[in-house]
Amino acid sequence: MSNLASLFDRYKALVIFDTETSGLNPGDDQIIELAALRVERTTAGALRIAGKMDTFIKLPEGEQLPENIVTLTGITDRLLETEGVQSGTAVSRFLKLVKPGPVLMVAHNAQFDACFLWELLRGFKPGHLDWLDSLTVYKDRRPYPHKLANAILAYELEDKVQNSHRAIDDVLALFEVLKAMDEERDDLGSYVNLFGYNPKYGVSGRRITGVRYEPQGFNKSITRPEQTLPARMSRR
């Protein structure tokens, strides 16, 4: 068995996180909102949110948000100016959630968020981090499309959570999606440090240390257990 509960035999916590960014290039663009939940297991075996952050981050002096980002997220230059913090403050808040470790970092399309996160953490020492990409899992569970909004609908969570292109809403939604995935099939642990990528485009951005990257196409239906990406990797 490799279900959600078993992950807490290996990790002190899951840190579910999401970013909103000023663009798509981690080298040129910045995180403008960073949200995260630290999820721990109680002695009774229940999951609880042990810590939470939702932080806006100021842009470098003289920079402004592209209009399409404002439209998509609702985050404005004025909001970042009045409510945003310096990047170092955001990092300090984030590091409080990843310690004590070890922790498992969880995100939907984790490759994107992890690349931006590493840029934010440059010069800091977060320690060793493992990764779980719910997008890779979801590609084995449902046919295209595979956005978080699609997972919310697939697991009938739309009355419980919202997907608003705001980081804090997305991490709360992903927590519920993760639990629904676990109820559906007990193999989440087999996806740790395994990122699927579209073979048509290759891996986007830098490769995250410790992560195994494997081509993963689109399925027309839920993948049988023996045909999931981890199962195929185990037979190599």
Name every feature range the model reports, one short phrase each.
Residues M1-D9, F175-R236:
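Acidic two-metal-ion nuclease catalytic site recognized across multiple nuclease folds
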Residues S2-H128, A149-H165:
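Conserved non-catalytic scaffold segment of RNase H-like nuclease domains
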Residues T21-G23, T136, A173:
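Short, glycine/acidic-enriched loop or turn micro-motifs at the edges of active sites
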Residues L120-G123, D140, A154, V177-E184:
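Active-site catalytic microenvironments for nucleophilic, acid-base chemistry
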Residues G127-L132, P145, K160, R185-G189:
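Short, structured loop/turn "capping" segments at alpha-beta junctions
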Residues W131-N150:
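Short alpha-helix plus adjacent loop in nuclease-associated cores
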Residues H146, L172-F175:
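A structural signal for well-ordered alpha-helical segments within the folded catalytic domains
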Residues I168-D169:
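Acidic donor-binding loop at a coil-to-helix junction in glycosyltransferase catalytic cores
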